Amino acid sequence: MSSSSLPTKSSNALLSVNFNQDHSCIAVGTRDGYSITNCEPFGRVYTNNAGPTSLVEMLFCTSLVALVATSDTDPKSNASPRRLQIVNTKRQSVICELLFPTAILGVKLNRRRLVVVLEQEIYIYDISNMKLLHTIETSPNPMAICALSPSSENCFLAYPSPVASPTSPFSNSGASSSAEANTTAGDVLIFDLLSLSVTNVIQAHKTPISALALNATGTLLATASDKGTVIRVFSIPAAQKLHQFRRGSYAARIYSLNFNAVSTLLAVSSDTETVHIFKLSSGAGAGAKGRSSSNGGESPSLNSFDGSSDSSSPPGSTTNATRGGYEAFMGKHKAAKSNGISGTLRRRSMALGRGITGSVGGYLPNSLTEMWEPSRDFAFLKLPSQGVSSVVALSSTTPHVMVVTSEGYFYSYAIDLEHGGECILMKQYSLIDPDLDTTSTARSDTATPSLAD
């Protein structure tokens, strides 16, 4: 579950819910309007009864909020799912409005970019002046699956690749062009929002992507497919596979992935009642900053097959959706593949395939090992209800796992950072009525902070 329409078994009043970028606040959209709630201490910071609000996205803890309303039956109403409002909550003013050709399904913000996700398009804006920088055409993406790095320096956008990568080990090399264009490859495209160019395509899963998350520094990407049994973590932008985790043996729909602030833990929520917390090795963050190496842990990205050593596209600002985009990236790699690996394979086949055997032999054992030895969770928690969608986050100030469900409840669980195991429920509140405390834990009776400019 993200800041989008909520599925079944949800509160009738709740339309959307989402944590902000540093997991310090929760943005809530309801049939009455929207609100901002502080996580610690828990308390409502801001409320506006502006009418049904389907999307609410904060910019960290500032007063800047992006809003999308639901359709209104009143013909005089200005509300439309195609209209985005950027609002200053402190000054009670609308900074700007943007109208799009189809309904807005997702909105992402960091301090440099605004990303608006439609079903088949992504719009990228400079947040300082709201200038449209780039438009990306995508395959149908009704769940608005994408991830934006909170970092201003490593400013990356990840979203499902529009076509299968031609060098994917999971694809059939003899398939037709229509089969090649299907969206079941499970590939993820990494787009640099500063240079406005594709930097890599990660072949993350065999089946379609269901969830993505980038860490706070924009150096790690977590991925899940619609099977939901395996979670993978890659370095960005090098696309080196660093971790593979086993969520469970049975398929589940992944609702949320989130790293903690220092990228040592990854929390995963699904349509089961169990939230899993996986532990990342201490060296993962540092390793993510470098380029991919030729060791056995390297992911099957495009570069690991076509021999290219530099995955970065040349920088440059453009508003052309093709130039610097997926087509340009794939065209470059298809040419490299034709001139590079294909010719190499033909030459090596004349030498009894010795080189081919070496390259394939180096890849297959790693794949088989990954199938047999995925890491299990370090800690877990059980939600009171099963079948509810949820958003999970890890507190940056306390060793707590925070979960918000589509029923409108906020849960805070204590995690043992040394031994792991089952987390302990510490607090439970209602987001619909923040004065309601349904646990025996005493609520902190302190003033809630106000949003800063």
From Swiss-Prot:
The keyword Protein transport applies. GO terms for biological process: autophagy of mitochondrion; glycophagy; nucleophagy; pexophagy; protein localization to phagophore assembly site; protein transport. It is found in: Preautophagosomal structure membrane; Vacuole membrane; Endosome membrane. It holds the Pfam family PROPPIN. The keyword Magnesium does not apply. Signal peptide: none annotated. Residues 284-324 are annotated as: Disordered. Keywords: Autophagy, Endosome, Membrane, Protein transport, Repeat, Transport, Vacuole, WD repeat. It is a peripheral membrane protein. A motif (L/FRRG motif) lies at residues 245-249. InterPro entries: PROPPIN, WD40/YVTN_repeat-like_dom_sf, WD40_repeat_dom_sf, WD40_rpt. Residues 289-320 have a biased composition (Low complexity). WD repeats lie at residues 9-49, 204-244, 249-288. GO terms for molecular function: phosphatidylinositol-3,5-bisphosphate binding; phosphatidylinositol-3-phosphate binding; protein-macromolecule adaptor activity. Its main location: membrane. One of its GO terms (cellular component) is fungal-type vacuole membrane. Belongs to the WD repeat PROPPIN family. Component of the PI(3,5)P2 regulatory complex. The PI(3,5)P2 regulatory complex regulates both the synthesis and turnover of phosphatidylinositol 3,5-bisphosphate (PtdIns(3,5)P2). Necessary for proper vacuole morphology. Plays an important role in osmotically-induced vacuole fragmentation. Required for cytoplasm to vacuole transport (Cvt) vesicle formation, pexophagy and starvation-induced autophagy. Involved in correct ATG9 trafficking to the pre-autophagosomal structure. Might also be involved in premeiotic DNA replication. The N-terminus might form a beta-propeller domain involved in specific binding to phosphatidylinositol 3,5-bisphosphate (PIP2), leading to the association of the protein to the membrane. This is Autophagy-related protein 18. It comes from Mycosarcoma maydis (Corn smut fungus). The gene is ATG18.
